[in-house]
Structures are given as C-alpha cells and as structure tokens.
C-alpha cells in the first residue's frame, strides 16, 4: 500500500532571528566531485542557504582526495567565490582503524564532528553510503551532539542502486553499507526525500523511517533557472537535429535502452537524419569502460555520434540549451534526477522515462507529452516524432522559488523547534529494571595465564554504585567452593565472589559466572581487557537503558603489551569500531562486538550462553550471531571504553579455522524460526554468496551456470 508523506512544514521566520549554523557532511559536492547527483543537490542547498545569510560549512568526507582537481584550489574557491568553508575531513594515520572503507570514513567523521559539535546547530548527511552512522548512533545514545539536529536526505540507497542497475553484491563492504544506511535513516532527527517514490520504496523494503519524515524537492541550481513565467519557455523546438543522452553512462540511467532505441532508428534507412551526443560521466559497464561499450554498439548506427564527459553541471545545461538539441533521460530506475530537474528548470526540450520519482518533477499536464515507458521501441518512436514534429519543454510540478524559500525558512526554525521535542528513542519496559540495576561483572580467566592484575585494577576503580564481581578461575587445581566477601582484594564496597573450575574453557567459565550472578545485567570481561575510564560501566548501563539494548558493545582500542609488562606502558596502535546487530555482515565477520559487553540477563538466557567447547577464542562471535538471529537488539557505541592488550609473547588463536567455522553454526541450525527483518538479512547473505560466485566465474572464465565438478565416484 502506497503512503503519502507530508511536505516540509511552512515556517515563518521572525525578523532578526539568529540563523542556525549549518554543516553539510557529504562525499559529493560540486567541484571536488564532477557530475554527481548528491553533490549537485547539496551545492544548490548550500548556495540557497548562503544567499539567505546562513553560515554554511561543507565537510568533504573524501578528505584530500577529490575525484577532480586539487583540494587546495577547491578550498580557496569555496572561500573566495562562495563565502563558505570547505573542509577536507582529516583522517589520522594513527591509530589505524580496523574497518571497511565506509565504516572507517564514518568513524573519522564522528571523531571530527564530536570535536567540533558546538560549532554547528544542524548537520546534513546523505543516506547513501551511511557515512553519518557513528555520529547518529552517538546522538541516539546520548554520548554527543545533544544540541545538534541531524537531517538525513534520501538520495538513493546502495541496494536500490543495485536493484536498478541489475547488479549483484560485489563485496562485504556493501553489506555493511546497507546496514549503516538503514540505521542512519532510522535514528535521524529528520529524514527528507525529494520524492514520495523513494520513501515508499524504503518502506516496502523493510526500512524503518523516523517519525519526522518529509518530502521536499531539490533546490534548483541558479545556472538552470528561467523566469517562472510560462511565456519564457519554448513551446516547441521544431528543428531537432541532435539527440543527447543526458546522464551517467550506465545501465541504470538507461544507456543500453538508449542504444537499443538507436539500433531501431538506424535500421530504418529512410528514417530522419540526426546526430547523437552522450553527455555524461564515464563508468564501468559489464567489467569494461562504458565508452568502449558505446563504441561497440555504434557499429550498427548510420548516424554520427560523440561523447562529452568533461562538463560540470552548469556547462552541461548550457550545452543542452543550444538550438536543435533534445535531451533524453531514459532511466530504468531513478529517484529525483537532477538531469530532469535541470532540463525542466532551464526550459530544455526533453523526453524522460516515467519511472521512480521522475513524474513528480513534471507538471501533471505535461507528463504525457514528455514521459515515456522505458522500452526501446517506444523511445525510438518518441524520438522519431520529436524530429518530425518538434519537442516541447516541460513545466515543473512545483514552483522553484517556493521550494527554495521553504528550505531556507525551515532551517531557520529547525534547531529551536527540535529542542522542544523529546529525543527519539526506542520505548523500553520500565518495569523490568531499576534506575541503577545490579550489574554482575563476570570475569573468567585462566589461572595459568599472567596479566589479570591490570584487569582487576581497572574493575576496582569503577564508580557504578550497584555492582557485584564474580571471578571464575578456570584451570584451577583446587576447585574449592565459592566464597564471598564484601570488601575483598580492595574492591571497595563491591561484592566479590570467586568460583574455581578445573576446566580451562573460558566459555564454560563465563557461563558458570553467569549462573552465580544476581544482576539484571551481566558485564563480561576477559583478562586482556582494561576499563580505563572509571565511569565505563556506568556509561554502558546508561546507554543500554536509553536505547533499550539487549546487548551493548563498544569500540575497542588495541595496545601492545606483555603479560609481564606494566599496564602503564600503553601504546595504542589500532582501533576497532563495530556495527552492532548487522546479521547479514555477521555471517562473514564479527561486526557485532567483542566478548567484553553488557548483556541483559534475560537476553543471555534466551541465547543459551557461550560455547562450552575447549577452543573458544571466537565464542563471542557465535554468541552474538545467535542473539542477532533471535532479533535481540545489539547496539554498539562508537566511543572507546575498552582497551585490549595484544601480548607480544603469546600467539593468538582468534583466526583459527576451527573457531571461524563454529561462528557460522547459528546460521545453519535446522528448524530455526526468524523474524521478517532477519529473513531480509539472510537474503542479503544469499545475494552476496551469489555475487562472489559470479565475480569468480567472470574472472576465471567459468560458465556462470556451472561450478567446479570432480569425476563421479562409482565405488
């Protein structure tokens, strides 16, 4: 069922009111990014806000690596020509971030924005690539950005692009990005889409949308604007001599469809005379350059053609304004393409496919004469008619001036209005926990290993007021009964109990400690981990209650050390942020978190505890996978509260094959029942597996329909 979402609310701005400071955090922006839809949309918005007197900063999330030109020159251009700050995102080399590209950039973005959070009232992120993920999590969790409003714009998620491009999942990073995009949208203060179409697509594909979700068209670039008096628009251009494919040279934008239509037109030797231009950015198509693809297809054409791939938005529109040119936007799937918006704004004659949000751009009275069903025969006939009888320009469905004013005024009232609304958070069951619930620290360690003293010392300094500590001594030769004391070993007022076990398996030790625990929450910690902040457990509890998490993990800093060395000589060399409850990515890598986590007792019992098997260095991954597949809420904090020591004098078993295989067991358990959300995640796992096979087959030349087969076994 199709829903209708409201437009941006109309805001009246009081004269003399302080305008909020705006940051647009994006990996595409005009200049550093050429011919980029997201970049054009954000550039137009930034220009409109600047004209209205706003302080606007662009945080360029690709750092000092623009796809075009030199970053120093672009910074100077934005300062002198636009009066804006263009800041390339700093990405420190140390500590090294253990993460895929999108996660790493998102984490660097969070670190920078947290440091500058008081410089901005409003921060924009695109949903595509999910680069606002950690910043948005931190606000939801109450860790940062209390006075900042996050606006996420819906441009086109990764899997929506995959669907429209008829492409498969090519790498694990794309699974991560899908989860980051979905989470960023769900936790945003505001979600704004230029079209009703994309919001409905999201709902139909299992996305959770925030309560404050709106539709607002893009601001039209000034370079593409005409006066809005219809008399200034071309009635009909009766001398169409050049057909211009306008858009990125890719399948989703209709390149193959357009070439198929040209085949039909050129097959008719008595057909009209014309030439063809491809006006758009080169891409990869079927594993090769799209320019090479066009060159091969042109062998069937009897008309001259050429490619123009080096124009920015303004010069591209100027080219289309030339006499005798017809723009063709033949997209198979599209949201609210700037190509159509700019042609409508500039009065350029056009034909556009009737897919996605394209009809929402065009006035209802003009849609029939401009829009077409994306089929080669239909497009060929529409081009033939345009050459024979001329082609009209189209009117916009909404006033461009009204759209810009609405965006500008909405920002003016946004930050003050947002502070009057309570934070968006998941409702929790208040009856099942107190303000300061009892937390049971479950510390299982092998008595034959040295280095537990530093972990114990970090536990002693914790300021959480309602804490008990269970020490599970694994591998003990003297399994004496459990003992308890209220002030054991300098633990202040914390109750401490010890249990001894002959078995050395840490998973079994953690389970034994959990059975002894009395707390509403269980906090697991191992002997290589330190809680350096005295409020670490307090923060874990506060965040878990705020977001109603069943399991809460955090980023981990790794430092070099030795079992015999001083814990004071710490040198952080790397850091690992996690994703939380991403069941799809979790089938291939532990993206959930580490063993050192806060777990609600009833969630622990639902999962059934850790593995009791002898080699259990990856029992955290298996445990967290089970929890994710049971739809328990796993949340991760981007802030570092855990420091993990990597011993220089001990080999690690973390990457052992046996342990890695065990982590897949939750995904292959027969007869398990999962929620619709988990079914969707598992479908992504299947798509990724299929993509890996197709990629391998393409690289090795193996037919796509056949795998490797050995000789038949006959006896």
Residue locations for each model-derived region?
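Short, acidic, metal-binding catalytic loop of nucleotide-sugar glycosyltransferases
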Residues: 457-466
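Acidic donor-binding loop at a coil-to-helix junction in glycosyltransferase catalytic cores
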Residues: 616-623
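A recurrent flexible, glycine/aromatic-enriched loop bordering the glycosyltransferase active site
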Residues: 507, 579-599
């Amino acid at each position: 069922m199709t829903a209708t979402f409201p437009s941006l609310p109309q805001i009246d701005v009081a004269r003399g009111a302080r305008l909020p400071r705006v940051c647009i955090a994006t990996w595409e922006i005009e200049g550093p990014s050429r011919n980029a839809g997201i970049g054009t949309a954000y550039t137009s918005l930034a220009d409109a806000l600047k004209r209205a007197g706003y302080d606007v900063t662009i945080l360029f999330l690709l750092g000092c690596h623009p796809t075009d030109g030199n970053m120093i020159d672009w910074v100077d251009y934005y300062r002198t020509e636009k009066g804006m700050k263009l800041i390339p995102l700093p990405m420190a080399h140390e500590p090294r971030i253990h993460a895929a590209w999108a996660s790493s950039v998102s984490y660097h973005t969070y670190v920078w924005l947290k440091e500058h959070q008081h410089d901005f009232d409003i921060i924009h992120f695109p949903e595509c690539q999910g680069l606002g993920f950690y910043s948005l999590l931190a606000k939801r969790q109450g860790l940062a950005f209390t006075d900042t409003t996050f606006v996420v714009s819906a441009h086109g998620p990764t899997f929506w692009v995959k669907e429209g491009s008829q492409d498969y999942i090519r790498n694990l990073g794309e699974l991560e990005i899908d989860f980051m995009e979905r989470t960023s949208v769900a936790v945003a203060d505001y979600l704004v889409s230029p079209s009703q179409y994309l919001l409905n697509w999201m709902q139909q594909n299992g996305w959770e949308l925030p309560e404050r979700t709106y539709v607002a068209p893009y601001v039209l670039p000034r370079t593409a604007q005409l006066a809005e008096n219809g008399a200034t628009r071309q009635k009909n251009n009766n001398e169409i001599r050049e057909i211009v494919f306008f858009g990125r040279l890719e399948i989703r934008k209709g390149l193959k469809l357009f070439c198929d239509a040209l085949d039909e037109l050129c097959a008719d030797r008595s057909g009209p005379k014309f030439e063809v231009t491809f006006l758009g950015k080169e891409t990869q198509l079927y594993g090769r350059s799209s320019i090479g693809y066009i060159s091969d297809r042109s062998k069937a054409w009897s008309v001259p053609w050429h490619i123009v791939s080096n124009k920015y938005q303004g010069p591209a529109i100027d080219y289309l304004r030339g006499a005798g040119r017809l723009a063709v936007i033949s997209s198979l799937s599209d949201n609210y393409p700037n190509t159509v918006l700019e042609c409508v704004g500039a009065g350029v004659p056009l034909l556009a496919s009737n897919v996605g949000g394209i009809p929402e751009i065009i006035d209802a009275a003009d849609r029939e004469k401009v829009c077409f069903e994306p089929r080669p025969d239909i497009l060929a006939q529409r081009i033939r008619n345009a050459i024979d009888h001329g082609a009209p320009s189209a009117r916009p469905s909404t006033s461009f001036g009204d759209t810009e004013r609405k965006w500008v005024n909405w920002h003016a009232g946004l930050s003050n209005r947002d502070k009057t609304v309570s934070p968006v958070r998941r409702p929790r069951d208040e009856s099942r926990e107190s303000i300061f619930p009892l937390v049971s620290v479950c510390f299982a360690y092998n008595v034959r290993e040295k280095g537990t003293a530093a972990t114990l010392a970090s536990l002693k300094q914790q300021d959480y007021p309602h804490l008990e500590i269970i020490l599970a001594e694994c591998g003990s030769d003297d399994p004496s009964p459990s003992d308890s004391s209220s002030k054991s070993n300098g633990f202040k007022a914390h109750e401490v109990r010890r249990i001894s076990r002959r078995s050395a398996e840490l998973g079994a030790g953690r389970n034994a400690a959990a059975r002894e625990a009395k707390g509403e929450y269980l906090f697991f910690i191992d002997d290589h981990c330190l809680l350096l902040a005295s409020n670490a457990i307090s923060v874990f509890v506060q965040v878990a209650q705020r977001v109603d998490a069943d399991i809460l993990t955090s980023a981990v800093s790794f430092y070099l050390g030795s079992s015999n060395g001083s814990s004071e000589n710490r040198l952080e060399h790397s850091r690992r942020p996690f994703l939380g409850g991403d069941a799809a990515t979790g089938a291939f890598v532990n993206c959930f978190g580490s063993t050192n986590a806060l777990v609600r007792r009833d969630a622990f019992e639902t999962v059934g505890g850790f593995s009791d098997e002898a080699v259990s260095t990856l029992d955290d991954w298996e445990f967290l996978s089970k929890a994710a597949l049971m739809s328990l809420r796993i949340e991760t904090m981007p802030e570092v509260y855990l420091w993990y020591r990597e011993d220089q004098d001990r080999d690690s078993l973390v990457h052992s094959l046996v342990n890695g295989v065990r982590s897949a067991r939750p995904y292959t358990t027969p007869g398990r029942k999962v929620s619709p959300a988990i079914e969707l995640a598992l479908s992504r796992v299947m798509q990724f597996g299929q993509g890996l096979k197709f990629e391998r087959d393409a690289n090795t030349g193996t037919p796509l329909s056949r795998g490797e087969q050995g000789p038949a076994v006959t006896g």
